[in-house]
């Protein structure tokens, strides 16, 4: 494939491309500089190339083809010689170089011959250019293009001087036609396009080094646009078809209405018409019953005639009714025409078009508001709006449209929990601190009953119930029979306590034995104690109702307890260590008392185990209980006493102040 074939093929394809976009080649006045540049790249060479130059180009192609074939033969011979003899390689290479130099000289001579020939210009149609490529490698286009890219890379650039000659044709702007570059030639040759595909080239004309991916992308966009156009056209057609169908439906409905109305009217007329009179059968000829004025010879009256066919007596009123029906039909036709116009253009609608607004503004400039029936004149000019609508539109200039209420978006995500307390002030100021103090006072939980409040307004809580409401009960302590078991238990404890104190210094071994025996006895009796405790718990659960305590009950309990423990234990007769034998019931009662105070102290046996039997502690507890009972009585007596001006209660200050010799002022 020759160099000139590439160039001519590129020009041809570029010529077709521009021909589709610019049909009028000769009209260059209305074109921009960019449009002219495209034309100068393609069309000017065709106008300036002559017929003789075209013939010489054909000869040049034939000569160059023969040279190309000789080069291929020389290369094949050189390859064979290289395999046989290594010494002959240098000679063959020199021969090949000489042959190549000769070919280059021949090419230069051919170019010089083209420059010497100058003839008159002719039209493009008379020019003949061989655009068909010549293949050397069995018709493979890709292999041929690779050869020319490698071998003839320097010679593809062809100037316009070699093909066209001088002088150039200049434009008014002084724009010269630039030559075709190597990239443009390779692009136009590689693109084998038809006239329908030239719209795609617009994207690649300026930048030829685009990738195949971008080309496919551009083609897809081009196809999408075509699909969108087709869809839009189909939608328009569908809308037109729907409009036609609606019109046909309306016509049919109108025709049906008219037919129904006609039938109804005919039925009504038949019902309203009176029965027609009949003449006598004897008079079958026309008769005249009118009064004739003899003076004027004019007929004044009604002419009655008789139909022989139907025997009906007819007047001239039927013709008038027919005329009225025709007039009504014409009125209906006019109304139907107006309905069609109303369907197409929404008459008396609240929406205003630009034409209606312009008409309204035109008349308002001509008329004055003081004119009679001002808005009626405006509506008459607008034609599609009433006077009220025109006035409403004019007054709407001063009104701002309402903004649509934005709906709150319901967020699916859980929001940040906010506190119900709103604090707008700065918390570091005095006002903010006061606000915080109020909030804390309101939010912090308080007790319902304030025990330390000395005022009467607060509700008091009675921790001990009044004596009137107490259920009277018998003194349970007096009726109890402790029996001999409890006395034996008290004596046994004291005996053990004294024995251990006497024998500490004399016999250590005996102490150990006694301790072991006591421990064993205690361990054996724990089981009995547990059984007794379980029985006591069951009895307590059965008696769920709590017994209320009376003052007499406390006093009797104190007397019995003081009289029982005031007696001293009997003296010890023997000093020797003896193991006292006690019954199981006495040991169980002892261990019941033991468990309340010494659950974990098994090793401290030498200590006195029972603090309840101390006389001093028992007296103190009795005194406290007696004070409580006496104060309860005093409190009930003072409930109805008067309150001081300050509202303070004397009870919380220890009764009357006069007893202590103190005044109210000193208390404060």
From Swiss-Prot:
GO molecular function ontology, one term from the record: histone acetyltransferase activity
Highest taxon, organism lineage = Eukaryota
* Region of interest (Disordered), residue spans: 57-124, 246-357, 403-432, 497-546, 561-583, 631-668
Q: Where is the composition biased (Acidic residues)?
A: 308-318, 642-651
InterPro entries recorded for this chain? Homeodomain-like_sf, SANT/Myb
Question: Which residues fall in a compositionally biased region of kind Low complexity?
Answer: 69-121, 293-307, 501-542
Renumbered to this chain, the Basic and acidic residues biased-composition regions fall at 246-268, 319-335, 632-641
Query: Transmembrane region positions?
Result: none
Q: Which residues form the Myb-like domain?
A: 344-398
Q: What is this protein called?
A: Myb-like protein W
Question: Which species does this protein come from?
Answer: Dictyostelium discoideum (Social amoeba)
Organism taxonomic ancestry: Eukaryota, Amoebozoa, Evosea, Eumycetozoa, Dictyostelia
